[in-house]
Every structure is written in C-alpha cells, then in structure tokens.
Design a protein with these regions (language model features):
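Ubiquitin-like/PB1-type beta-grasp interaction modules and other compact soluble beta-rich domains
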Residues: 1-93
Length: 94
C-alpha cells in the first residue's frame, strides 16, 4: 500500500511518501491507529477534531485510490495491497 502525506502530515512523518505492507487487509481505522502508534499524538491530533476522537478534522480529506469520500462506515473501509492512500489537509484563505 502506498501513502502520500501532504502538509502538515509530512512534517510529522518526515516523509512525503511511504510504502507499507500488511499480512492481511485492514480497515482505515486500523491504519490510522497504526500511524498513531508509529508517529504519536501529533499525527492523531491532525486526524481527529480536537477533543473528539472518532470525528474527522474538518480540514482532513483522505483519498483512497483517487476517490475522496466519507460515509457512516468510512472508518470500516477495507484497505488492501496496492491501494493508494493520501492524507491531505484542505486550507482556504487568502
């Protein structure tokens, strides 16, 4: 599985890209938990709305295989070998 980290995620991971392999399929929630353990609280603070784990940050978009979507069971989305995942923050302003 290949991952891309846009700012500010790449500041936490110290990488723009990462390739990882797992022995079995895993859910998006498990992937986020994996990165939380690997990169610490700074990573999870970017994912979740402040003080509300389980609610994505309003700035976060996770793109899986070129599609950005969120639905009630988004965290249960199964990821597999060959998937491309992008963690991106959407900023607006002038």
């Amino acid at each position: 599985m290949s991952l891309e980290f846009s700012p500010p995620f790449n500041e936490v991971t110290q990488n723009l890209n990462e390739t990882i392999e797992f022995e079995k399929e895993l859910s998006l929630a498990e992937l986020i938990e994996f990165f939380g353990l690997k990169y610490g609280e700074k990573f999870t603070d970017l994912v979740w709305e402040k003080g509300n784990k389980g609610v994505f940050s309003k700035y976060l978009s996770i793109i899986i295989n070129g599609r950005s979507y969120q639905h009630d069971k988004f965290l249960e989305t199964k990821l597999k070998d060959g998937d491309q995942i992008v963690f991106i923050y959407i900023y607006f302003g002038g």
